[in-house]
Amino acid sequence: MGASMNIGVRGSKLAIEYAKQVEAKCFNSFHTNLITIKTDGDIFENKSIQDIGGKGVFVSAIEQQLLDKKIDVAVHSFKDLPAVMDSRLEISAVLERNDPRDCYIGTLFPKAIVGTGSPRRIAQLKTNFNVDFDIQHIRGNIDTRIQKLEQGKYDAIILAVAGLEALDLQHK
């Protein structure tokens, strides 16, 4: 093995799984350490993304670690990146895109309580269904969202197929 590489990543199962993919595809000749970093988006899980700063809440703490040279590489989900990046940083690699589809878990019916944290998904629900759903905000990692569904807090939740597949949860 060659040099050592510290890879900064959020601590969710999904983020770690994606970091392992980056590790295997980009850094297989290095000894690597996955360094999990809590972000504002992780710490303030009960607040909306807009209430805690909007775009960047899942990346700013990791990027600061990169700028402070505490990590060598940061792994992010593209959807979490702000439109304008810090000029001192660059995107060095992008893995092939996974399945871009969304799916629902649960039961959809008129007035169903549907959980999503995405403005895009809310717009798609309102545009693509002639049904009046009760769309409620939901935050948390995939496991947390599924748990909230199973506890009866929602009738259905909308999730990314790619995330479910990465965690081998597509059977849900």
Residue ranges of model-derived segments:
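Domain-level signature for soluble enzymes in the chorismate/prephenate branch of the shikimate pathway
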Residues: 1-172
